[in-house]
Amino acid sequence: MIDYKGAFHTGEYRNVLEEYGYDPLLIQERLADTWRVLFEGDEDARIFHNQGEDLGYMLDTGNLDARSEGMSYGMMMAVQLGHKEVFDRLWRWTKRYMYMETGENSGYFAWSCNPDGSRLSDGPAPDGEEFFAMALLFASHRWGDGEAPLNYGTQARDLLRTCIHKGEDGIGHPMWNPQNKLIKFVPNCEYSDPSYHLPHFYELFALWAYPEDRHFWKKAAEASRDYLRSACHPVTGLSPEYAYYDGTPNNERGYGHFYSDSYRVAANIGLDWEWFREDHWACEEANRIQAFFADKQPEDYRRYAINGEAFEEKALHPVGLLSTNAMASLAATGDNARASVELFWNTPLRTGPRRYYDNCLYLFTLLALSGNYRIWTPE
């Protein structure tokens, strides 16, 4: 475990795969092949689809819709790997079909649309907004700003302003609670989703948002790191899908256990450590969650209570789970870091109708473990 300052300070990113002995050429080949399958592959493998001359969308293959989560994930993947045309297609589609201009959610994005662009919901999901904003800022810094809607930096700053000031005029609700600075599950509720907490993004929003908003984002980064300590079980490392503001599981609708959303927490903690190295708790948490899964086979992954008690129900996205557990190796110092990465490397992309979520997490993990999930700063 190399304990230098985070990549934000050094500009240097760990290539964990190379550290563990994988051939650099094979790593780059795997990255290129994974992009090709997901964005250019056969109909039964890809999750990105071109539409018309200048649009494109990410398909949730299990639900046959386009989600703000997936659109923003696709944009982040595209900016990290330098695919500007794909990025612009996704963003144009998002602005055209998902962006809401009226009503209590004006300024946000509908979380679910049909592939033809018709809306399935008029509600937003804040994990989409935060990924849109981060991807847009990176695009602004990597490629420069164009004409609207490709004026990436302004689009990002306007969105971030909406996310924290919405409702101040009495219409709608902010996505972050103004008092405790914690991201909400949806704007009109007062509880959270631990997997939405991205302090490493908020640190960057604190640099690049509109000046009057920067202090809020700095405080949000601190609040989210504290929150994750509360939401992750002190022995197993597991966190619930929904949690109250004190971190305790919110099981009112059955989402108080470790299941699909929860998997992202390990990945987020790993990337926060790689970028900023703010809190050594991240290393302890990564060790805990990898230790919990060390003796479990992916085909037998389950839904778990956060104390580790297994339910009968099998995991819906086992490839996603083993991927995020591997991404935690950015922070992990324990004996399971290498084994988690080896399991990931030896697992192929998922096929079939449930592949969308698993393979998004797979590509993010591949980016992160190869040193290619980077902070793009202004020139």
How should these model regions be labeled?
Residues 27-73, 78-121:
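Internal amphipathic alpha-helical repeat/solenoid segments
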Residues 64-71, 118-144:
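Aromatic-rich carbohydrate-recognition surfaces in CAZymes
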Residues 75-82, 131-142, 200-207, 267-274, ...:
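Short glycine/serine- and small hydrophobic-enriched flexible loop segments
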